[in-house]
Amino acid sequence: MASLSVSSSSTIIDSRAPPSRLASASASSPSCISLPTLPIQSHTRAAKATAYCRKIVRNVVTRATTEVGEAPATTTEAETTELPEIVKTAQEAWEKVDDKYAIGSLAFAGVVALWGSAGMISAIDRLPLVPGVLELVGIGYTGWFTYKNLVFKPDREALFEKVKSTYKDILGSS
């Protein structure tokens, strides 16, 4: 009569492990390690967890509703917050725009260009000698601009007039 036995433990065979002293006659046989089996998951445990979650949901729902005989709270005063003037102006300007798709596309392109230029500046800043040279160029240009446009009163007034006229050209005379 033949009998069949099934082992429920897992076995790992490590062929690189050195043979143990207690190994049988053949020294080249691989080492075997047995691992314990995992405990069997009971279905009642999952059912208990589901029931507990349903109980929590039921409690949350009952807490969200009003009690019997209790009237819901109503406010007699309507609380309104005024929008800042710049938001109102922006909303009015957006309503006047005919081609909103083009404006949205330009805004998206501007964000992408800003992101790309920030990456390019970051890459240039990592170069060894370039940041120091660019800083010197910036200091020199700032000094030249200050001397040419801001030191003397007639030059300063001419600069202010040029800025105001450019501002009117961009936004239109209103």
Curated annotation (Swiss-Prot):
The chain crosses the membrane at residues 101-121, 127-147. One of its GO terms (biological process) is membrane bending. One of its GO terms (cellular component) is chloroplast thylakoid membrane. It is found in: Plastid, Chloroplast thylakoid membrane. It is a multi-pass membrane protein. The modification N-acetylalanine is found at residue 64. Residues 122-126 are lumenal. InterPro entries: CAAD_dom, CURT1. Disruption phenotype: No effect on growth behavior, leaf coloration, grana stacks or photochemical efficiency of photosystem II. Curt1a, curt1b, curt1c and curt1d quadruple mutant shows disorganized thylakoids with extended stretches of unstacked membranes and broader stacks made up of fewer layers. Phosphorylated on either Thr-65 or Thr-66 by a threonine specific thylakoid kinase. Residues 64-100, 148-174 are stromal. The keyword Repeat does not apply. Residues 1-20 are annotated as: Disordered. Keywords: Acetylation, Chloroplast, Membrane, Phosphoprotein, Plastid, Thylakoid, Transit peptide, Transmembrane, Transmembrane helix. Belongs to the CURT family. Homo- and heterodimers and trimers. Interacts with PSAL. This is Protein CURVATURE THYLAKOID 1B, chloroplastic. It comes from Arabidopsis thaliana (Mouse-ear cress). The lineage of its organism: Eukaryota, Viridiplantae, Streptophyta, Embryophyta, Tracheophyta. The gene is CURT1B.
